[in-house]
Structures are given as C-alpha cells and as structure tokens.
Amino acid sequence: MMTSLVSAQTKLVSLLGDSYSIYEVFVTPSTNELWYYAKNVPQKTDVQNVGQTWWHQIIRENGWRLCVNNSYSGATISYTGYDGNDYSARSFNTRMTELGQPDIIFVFGTTNDSWAGTPIGEYK
C-alpha cells in the first residue's frame, strides 16, 4: 500500500547547473547569471522557450514539478574560473546546499571547468 502512495506523488526536481540548465524566470536566486532568456537573443541561442530546455522536457514528460533551479551561467564545480579568477560565489560547491527539499536532483556541470582549464587536483 505504501509503495502505491509514494509512486502516486508528484516528484519535485531541483537543478544544479551551468548555462545549459538555466532559463530566465526559472532560476533561483534571480541574481544568477543567465544564458537563456524569455525574450530570445538570436545571436546568442536558438532556444525560443523554456519547453526546449533538456530539463524542462524531462520534468514535463514525467509529470514532475520544478522545486529549485540553482543554475549559473559560467559556473565551475571548483572555486577557480576563467583566467584563474575566484568563482567561489558561483561554484557548484557553494550552491549545492541551496536546492530546497527535492526528491530528485539533476547536476549538469564541468563544461566551464574544462573550457577554463581549471586544475583538477588530486583524488584523496
């Protein structure tokens, strides 16, 4: 009986990502740097609406609801960003505690770490 009650509940999904997971109005906090805007900038992207984002399609197709989208354009996993700049405030490590109470968490990252040449460090 308990299994059917749990499976009948709508799952809440949170996102921790970079520009590939962001969309204006669907991001918390609203001060996070954006890449996809509600009013499309054709020179920048061909994404016309939030329904074209990978995460929105998955959430919609499964009947889930968005809890928190804490994505940040240009974010790195580590605290080091482009040109060796301090990216602590936008780091995945900093933002990972700000995802609400979701049932599912999607993490999409490392793109900027790779492009910025961020040091990988050592496995310990």
Predicted region positions:
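Boundary at the C-terminal end of the N-terminal hydrophobic targeting segment
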Residues: 6-8
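Conserved SGNH/GDSL esterase-like catalytic core that processes O-acyl groups on lipids
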Residues: 12-14, 23-123
